Amino acid sequence: MNVSKIKSTEWLVVAGGVLVVIFGLLRWFSWEIDNSGVVIKGKTNAFDYLLTGVVPWLLVGGAALVTVLLASGTIARSRVPWPLVILAATVLGAVLILIRVIISDDPDTTGNVDVDVSRGIGLWLSAVGSIIAAAGAFLTYQANSFDSRTSNPGAAPRPDREIPPTTS
């Protein structure tokens, strides 16, 4: 596999995907429940949250994998609009992880207990990685859509509308 074919914008998708895959395994939340001197501690990672943990982990990690496979030529660039698919996957993954950052974690408790919940390093770096991947996917999509408009090397870009010929 020749990684020299990977563009710099695609490297952003790959790096962001690697961050999400690695830091999805680490601590996303830690919590401590104190009930009259009895303390219970726990921690969670991406796999404790299906919609806002596992799904974005698969989306962003899969987008990074597809990006590498496309650049290496393992997957053929067919009629599938891969830059758009990768953009959609990374943006959806980033939105879902950011939702998890916002809504936090709420351990089930009843009665008069003290609950302390804190976000872990895994959640923060997964959020950063998903944003990096989404930014790289957006830049790759922009570059590919510009390249498709100017596909003839050496020729002028195609106009957005037809200009009628002038008669002299």
Model-found features: residue ranges?
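Compact integral membrane and secretory-pathway proteins
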Residues: 1-168
